Structures are given as structure tokens and as C-alpha cells.
Amino acid sequence: TEGYGAAYALNPKYQEELSKLLNANLVFVEYRYFLESTPEPKNWDYLTAENSAYDLHNVRNTFKQIYPEKWISTGISKGGQTTMLYRAFFPDDVDFSVPYVGPLCKGVEDGRHEPFLRKVGTKAEREKIQDFQLEVLKRKSDMLPLLESYCKNKNLTFRIPMPEVLDYCVLEYSFALW
């Protein structure tokens, strides 16, 4: 289950961790209202957790005829949320649910992330991470060409300027690491 757009899964070299480990087939489902799954006209009334669960239920029922063995639902971030919601609405559809990350936010400002980041790991590890982040920001003018070159070589594109991409990478590093 993908929580966002699924275009990257079209890459012939793409492999998802569980399907690789289990030598399993992969049915990759793009979340409604993202990329190619955006209807015209956009009627936001249909963008609900229940409808997304029904989407997965219908996909699973269709493919279960072809793939009758065990089923796993997995996802990261919004995909993790989708995995949990799918299990909540259709508890018997899949044999296993593996939400790698599934943040269920309490509101626009959740408040749980900061205390987590202040306690995770050891104090020395947290200090090393913060020192690294500060060092990268101090050397931003040197780091930016390296990031631009890397992104160009990997054909990565963004909707924001590259200096902002670097800022996000640095500021989100501790959260992404843990």
C-alpha cells in the first residue's frame, strides 16, 4: 500500500523489502488523489480513509483469484497509515500487516516528535547527530554543489529549490535516522 504516488514502483529495478525477502509477488497500489489516481473533476468528498481501505479491498479481491496464497499489506509513512486503516476496516483481508512507519497524528500540531527526539538513542549519539547537522549547515555553500551533482546523476528532481532540499535533508535527518 502506497500512501502517495506510485510512479517510482514502475522502475524495473524497484524492489520492495518484504517481497524481496520472501520472494513474493508485489501489487503496488497508488493512493487515490495522487498522480495518475487523481480524478477530474476533483471531488474531495471521496478522499476518505474508508474509501482508501475499500480500494485496497477491491484490489485484493480481484487479484486473490490470481494469487491465492498469503497476503501482506505494508507501507511507509502515509503508506503505513494506510496499512493500519486497511487492517481496521478489513481485518481478514490480509495475513500480515507491516506498517514500517505509521504516524497517526492527533492534530496539525501533534507534539510527540520533539520529546521522542530528545530521548531516543544516547545523549552522546544525539549530540553527534546535532553536531553533524550544524556542520553541514555551516558548510552549506560547499555541500550544495555535491547534492546537486548527486541528484543530477540519480535523475532526482524536486518542486522546491535545491537549497531548500538541503535544508530539509539536514533538519529531518535525526527524525529519519531514528
PLM regions: where:
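N-terminal cap/lid subdomain of alpha/beta-hydrolase-fold enzymes
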Residues: T1-N51
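Short, flexible loop/turn elements at secondary-structure junctions
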Residues: E2-G5, Y33, S77-K78, V101-L104
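Loop/turn elements at helix/coil->beta-strand transitions in domains of secreted/extracellular proteins
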Residues: L22-L26, P68-K70, D92-D95
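A structural signal for short, well-ordered beta-strand segments and their strand-loop junctions
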Residues: F28, S73-T74, F96-P99
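Alpha/beta-hydrolase active-site loop
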Residues: D45-I66
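Alpha/beta-hydrolase fold nucleophile elbow
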Residues: Y67-S77
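Glycine-rich nucleophile elbow surrounding the catalytic serine of serine-hydrolase chemistry
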Residues: G75-L85
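Alpha/beta-hydrolase
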Residues: L85-W178
